[in-house]
């Protein structure tokens, strides 16, 4: 059973902590959460000329302020709950077992409402977020005769890589002539079946075949010359 001196000592601690929290809220305007982000918080009139990455520090500080404000609000709520329990004469009684909470525990944690063995256990999860898991067991299936995956990890990477990567010609063992050739398997056909479909076109009626000069067309001609043929789908005999 808590003595009057012990109870008064704990009450004074709770009231002083409550006063400190309210003063902090007043001094820092609730961690500046009442200020508009990002303009009022870091003085910029506009964010149009700033890359989103340039606001990473400000965003991190904003997120931290939100977490600190939430922590202080929860602490303040626990303090008010304990002060109300003192008024009701139930302070120092475990809300689970109904037994008295030792003074030593209350002195260390004045907002304690249960015995140590009944306190909530905050277990930190060791599970990693789903985006860190490997989406496929194998990166590509091109070399596997038994598996013909229509869409594998390589395709996923290429879909993202088309928006750009950090590679430069100096990083390559055989530097390409064009930045368009920096991507993985840049020479493979995309959106067509035959390699010549990259540089030919027809009009709306399917007639008037046009050949466009391009790197793909040059490579196609070189391959035909190396093989000594005129087409990849069967040789053509000149009249």
Curated annotation (Swiss-Prot):
PROSITE patterns cross-referenced by the UniProt entry: ZF_DKSA_1, ZF_DKSA_2
Name the segments for region: Disordered: 133-182
User: Gene3D superfamilies, alphabetically?
Assistant: DksA, coiled-coil domain
Q: Does the keyword Nuclease apply?
A: no
> Keywords assigned by UniProt?
Metal-binding, Zinc, Zinc-finger
- InterPro entries according to UniProt: DnaK_N, YteA, Znf_DskA_TraR
Zn finger (dksA C4-type) ranges are 94-114
Molecular function in Gene Ontology = zinc ion binding
The answer to keyword Disulfide bond applying to this record is: no
Q: Which Pfam families match?
A: zf-dskA_traR
Which NCBIfam families does the protein's record reference? bacill_yteA (TIGR02890)
Q: What is this protein called?
A: Uncharacterized protein YteA
- Source species: Bacillus subtilis (strain 168)
